[in-house]
Amino acid sequence: MEMRSAKLMNGRVFAGARALYRAAGVDGKDFGKPIIAIANSFDEFLPGHVHLNKVGRLISDAIKEAGGIPREFNTMAVDDGIAMGHTGMLYSLPSRDIIADTVEYQVNAHCADALICIPNCDKVVPGMLMAALRLNIPTVFVSGGPMEAGTTVLPDGTVKKNTDLIDVMYASADDNLNEEDLLAYEKTVCPTCGSCAGMFTANSMNCLTEAIGLALPGNGTILASHSYRKDLFKRAAEQVVKIAKQYYDDDDDSVLPRSIATKKAFENAMTMDVAMGGSTNTVLHILAMAQSADVDFTLDDIERISHTVPCICKASPSGEWEISDVHRAGGITGILGELDRAGKLHRDVHSIDYKSLEDKLNDWDIMRDTCTEEAKQMYLAAPGHIVSPEPWTHTTLFDSLDRDRVNGAIHDIDHPAVTEGGLAVLRGNLAPDGCVVKTAGVPKEIWTFRGPALVVESQEQAIEVILNDTLKPGMALVIRYEGPKGGPGMQEMLYPTSFVKGKGIGKQVAMLTDGRYSGGSSGLAIGHIAPEAANKGPIALIKNGDIINIDIPNRTVNVELSDEELAQRRAELEAGDGYVAHRDRKVSQALKAYAAFARSADKGATRDPELIDKLSGLA
């Protein structure tokens, strides 16, 4: 197979291109080696990305040593935690598609032969995955790694262990805490570089990347602060050169992203996601990834999987365990191992480093006698409790692995943390095309809920009614016109879910939105309602006092109105202002462009390809 870069490295026509490569530091004697694009996302705004400049240099050196030509570039990264609660959050989800575009543009414009992606936080991971699946060249993912959890000591001497970003958000709405208490949380909940501690969106996506087969073992769970992460970066760099040579020298197309990320691989990844109670945002992103890969994987597949897979890992914010605890229990291969023993996975899939799932699990599942010493050692990587934005600050190890599948961080199928899966798809007259709830984070006592609606038309209005105590126990807060088109941008609702907990009513209210929730959200928080209000969805017809009925066991969500009543309301709405939010929000041209092409949440909130084809006139 001729390398993509061969056209530039040979012949008189492209002498100018070679001159530019020489000027950028490529030695002429290296012409003919595979050009490996390093898609980095270094960014000083985000603790999850602040160290990636060092990672990029490390990977670049390792690629060169392995026989490739490393060429590093950067794309953007939005910090959802910083963008949260104001109009900045409108830009988060749209950035995913722009990130995908930037990687595609850069790689194709410069004829790169292979790609190594260094994402970490929420939208960067799926954006790069979408690009890799579009490009379909040899690709390896290696993320920046998760942050350590913090330890907070309050002024009165109270010690709070395993605190994270969500704790400071809860604290900010707790009227019982003073400013000194709040400052103590603020200073300690994010102690290291890395993606926010807990099974939030970033860590969920990095785990999913490992499960689908495009990253090496440990990608989802080795802490950013641990020296073993440095080893992982080097191995990833060596692996991308190896598979580039397999493809171009040996005509082995099994190493390509689309050969790895088949429908069966998507089903395995989603099975793992449901089993670990990942962020609801993973549903949006895996649907978008499937479209980029031309794989027929839909919300119906996710709904089917959610009915058959229990939750066997309840990590923060849904449970007591931190990412480092999940790592000690064997990480993602530990979860996959339990699912494999239960017959829940397709075995005829492969990955960037193994020809079969069975071979990988034989080497990396700590519950198997065949598990390698390398794997056992890697899964001992522990927090170092060194407060620093620098990576690789320590070599701390746990005393032992967690092989307790009854009471440990990872359970076996016979002793699940929750008998139902950690994610569920609900449908009903309020969400005909579906909606999503993170069941792992919902207290069992409110899996069924019936209460009057309190309707708002923006996240800002939602925050106001929570903080001024308009939202009462027993109510269902309906937040509409925050979908992909209606927002536009489909904001996350972490502040509302955090503030109801801070107010002490987290187990007494429901939230429903055509927007989405942070991976850090928990409680009865139903998102991705489709169709959204701006697309004439029934959520646009709800009025204050309407009775909302939620039944997670039976997977339903309804408003107690007849079809005739809903039809009458629709006629009245369309005779009036129509499907328009009543709020004061200025929308930029950039966001209007996103809204113009955005599809519904049940389609991954991606751009509408048919509309693009129609308007462009291009096939």
Curated annotation (Swiss-Prot):
For this entry, the protein name equals Dihydroxy-acid dehydratase
A single cellular component GO annotation: cytosol
- Keywords annotated in UniProt: 2Fe-2S, Amino-acid biosynthesis, Branched-chain amino acid biosynthesis, Iron, Iron-sulfur, Lyase, Magnesium, Metal-binding
Describe which pathway this protein belongs to, using the record's wording. Answer: Amino-acid biosynthesis; L-isoleucine biosynthesis; L-isoleucine from 2-oxobutanoate: step 3/4; Amino-acid biosynthesis; L-valine biosynthesis; L-valine from pyruvate: step 3/4
Q: Which PROSITE patterns match?
A: ILVD_EDD_1, ILVD_EDD_2
**What HAMAP family does its record include?**
IlvD
Q: Which Pfam family, any one, appears in the UniProt record? A: ILVD_EDD_N
Q: Name one GO biological process term.
A: isoleucine biosynthetic process
Q: Which gene encodes it?
A: ilvD
Annotated residues for binding of [2Fe-2S] cluster: 121, 196
What is the role of this chain? Functions in the biosynthesis of branched-chain amino acids. Catalyzes the dehydration of (2R,3R)-2,3-dihydroxy-3-methylpentanoate (2,3-dihydroxy-3-methylvalerate) into 2-oxo-3-methylpentanoate (2-oxo-3-methylvalerate) and of (2R)-2,3-dihydroxy-3-methylbutanoate (2,3-dihydroxyisovalerate) into 2-oxo-3-methylbutanoate (2-oxoisovalerate), the penultimate precursor to L-isoleucine and L-valine, respectively.
Single GO molecular-function term?
A: 2 iron, 2 sulfur cluster binding
Q: Which residues does UniProt mark as catalytic? A: 518
Query: Could you give the cofactor binding note from the entry?
Result: Binds 1 [2Fe-2S] cluster per subunit. This cluster acts as a Lewis acid cofactor.
Q: Which organism is it from?
A: Bifidobacterium adolescentis (strain ATCC 15703 / DSM 20083 / NCTC 11814 / E194a)
Quote the InterPro entries the UniProt record gives: Dihydro-acid_dehy_C, DihydroxyA_deHydtase, DiOHA_6PGluconate_deHydtase_CS, ILV_EDD_C, ILV_EDD_N, IlvD/EDD_N
Q: What is the annotated quaternary arrangement, including any partners?
A: Homodimer.
